[in-house]
Structure formats: structure tokens, C-alpha cells
Amino acid sequence: MKHSVHFGAGNIGRGFIGEILFKNGFHIDFVDVNNQIIHALNEKGKYEIEIAQKGQSRIEVTNVAGINSKEHPEQVIEAIQKTDIITTAIGPNILPFIAELLAKGIEARRVAGNTQALDVMACENMIGGSQFLYQEVKKYLSPEGLTFADNYIGFPNAAVDRIVPAQSHEDSLFVVVEPFNEWVVETKRLKNPDLRLKDVHYEEDLEPFIERKLFSVNSGHATSAYIGAHYGAKTILEALQNPNIKSRIESVLAEIRSLLIAKWNFDKKELENYHKVIIERLENPFIVDEVSRVARTPIRKLGYNERFIRPIRELKELSLSYKNLLKTVGYVFDYRDVNDEESIRLGELLAKQSVKDVVIQVTGLDDQELIEQIVEYI
């Protein structure tokens, strides 16, 4: 049986990446620091995924195990030494924390003489995630390890898309996911091109697809949350049931479409259909997606290269409309949740400093005209 190591045994890891790896015939070693999840994986050796649609079918994922990377790093290194593929779903901010362990695993492959090509795919909500991880891993590799990695270890970037809402079940491994999923991998950085996963798309140039996903799904999803919060909606479905909110989301997606078509020459009709499907996904009555989950960490989401400011910058450069995105950014600055540290911090910054200074600090912008435009909407 083929072997995989997956960092991150959370809902996305189990409910998306784990399902695909299982369907491709892999044994999966889930690596995490959550002892409850790791214990359950080792005790049961399987878990169930429910598809959030009419009929609510279930998939049983078997041949799984767990490794606590904090308690047993040596087991992770051993697993990396023999594995056929490595994936992650831990969040962009956590990637640097697994770099040293990955480097030790790569060194172990070198010492053992394992020259089977291996690809490491960071399945995160970020542009260039795998290459970012590689830069972190390189810091811990010996000169020999660097040469070995250059020859045998690939870090192809990936774009992933599946809505997995926050949830809690008596069975800690059980997870509910939406029917839709998309996983795209760039081919040019693959070291093991013969290992092709079914239900995964492979593209020579990934950047258009990553931007299509981040600027469409992430921007649209977040827009529904921040506007929804402004109007008192508690779930994304509730937000979409408000015609005013739905219309605003569609207006934001129209601006995103104009950017993607101008920049990447996407087919207009295909992109319109892609955005129609996004709206349908957000309206899924079988998913309870809390506004508070989608709207959390507003400071991060207002970043220079994030889902709002980056498309706004690029639309401005192309002299295309971004008025609806600007309005949404205003709602992001207004968002408050007592349980979200970043939203509280954002409120504190606005109370202590001028709005303009906070906009500059949070967005990293130096375009004075654009800064003033954002200030007008706060």
C-alpha cells in the first residue's frame, strides 16, 4: 500500500485531503499535536465523512493512524523517511513550525539512500504555499541535504477549495463537508510526476487558478461574512437569504471577474458560471457556517496581498472599478467579535490612532489616493 504523511488532523485535513488520499489507495499518517485526535485515530484506525447534501451520504476513511509530533518527533521522521507523498493543511502561519521536522525527515531519507522522488504539497489558503514551506525547510538542511532535496524532493504549489465549517460532534473524528472540492497542483515543480492523484487537477501554471480561487471563493466568502455581520446575520446561509447582501456579494464577484479576465484571460462565461456555483455553495442549507468563523482574523484578511487589498490594488492599476470591494473593506474595519482577538485589537487601534494611520498600518499600502478612498468607507 502507498504511504502518505499529512500534517494537520483537523477538519480540513480529515474531511478533504484525507478523503482524496484514501480514495487514491494511501495509508495516511496524520501528524498533529492534538492528543485527543491522535489517540482516536490510532484507536479506531478509521473515521467517517458526511457530505452536506440531500441524502447526506457518508464515506468511511480507513487505513489511518496518528502521530503526535510534539511527543514523538522521531516517529514523524521515520514516517517521512519511507513515505510516497507529504501534504499539509495546518494554516499558513503554522508552516514554519513544521519546517525543522520536515528537514530532519529529508535528511533521514538521504542517509538511508532513499532516492525515490517525493513531493511535498502545502494545501493552504495562500499563494505559493509549498515554495514558502521549502524556504523554511532549507534553513534546517545541511549542504548535503540541500543537494539531496534539490534532486529528489519537490515542493509543488497547490490550490485547494472546500468549505468545511466549524463543528463539534460526540465522535471527535467525524466531519461534515460540502460536496464541492477542488485541488489543483502545479506540474512544473513536481519531482514525482508519475504519481498522479485522481480527483486532483494538474496545471503547468498554477497562479491563475490560485488567484481565481483566493479572489473568488475567499473574497466572496469573507464578503458574505462581514456584510452579514453588519446586518446581524449569524450564519452565511442567513446572510445569503438577505437579497441586499446577496446582491452586494454578486457585485464584488463582478469586480473580481473583471480583474481575472483582464489579467489571466479567463473565459467570461466560464468564470460567470464558476461564480454562480460559489453563490450556490454559500447557500447550501445542509451546512451551518457561522459568520464568526468566516469573519475571524480581520487584520490578517486586510493584508497587502490578501483577499481584499490585493485585488483592489490590481483593479486600480488596470483602471477598473473596485467600489464594491472598497465598501466591503469598510465593513471589515467595522467588524467586532469579543471572541476574536484581531477584531478587538483593530477596534483598539482605531480608538487610539487616526483612521488613516490604522489603514496604512494594517494594509501596508503607500498609495495615498487608495488609502484616502478606504478611509472614506470606514
UniProtKB/Swiss-Prot annotation:
Recorded catalytic activity of this chain's protein: D-mannitol 1-phosphate + NAD(+) = beta-D-fructose 6-phosphate + NADH + H(+)
Residues that, per the record, bind NAD(+): S4, V5, H6, F7, G8, A9, G10, N11, I12, G13, R14, G15
Gene Ontology terms: biological process: mannitol catabolic process
Record bears the keyword Nucleotide-binding: no
EC number of the protein: 1.1.1.17
A GO molecular-function descriptor: mannitol-1-phosphate 5-dehydrogenase activity
Keywords noted in UniProt: NAD, Oxidoreductase
Keyword Oxidoreductase belongs to the record: yes
GO cellular component, one term: cytosol
The protein's enzyme class: oxidoreductase
InterPro entries: 6-PGluconate_DH-like_C_sf, 6PGD_dom2, Mannitol_1_phos_5_DH, Mannitol_DH, Mannitol_DH_C, Mannitol_DH_CS, Mannitol_DH_N, NAD(P)-bd_dom_sf
Cystine crosslinks: none
Cited Pfam families: Mannitol_dh (PF01232), Mannitol_dh_C (PF08125)
HAMAP family tied to this protein: Mannitol_dehydrog
Family: Belongs to the mannitol dehydrogenase family.
Protein name: Mannitol-1-phosphate 5-dehydrogenase
Organism of origin: Streptococcus pneumoniae serotype 4 (strain ATCC BAA-334 / TIGR4)
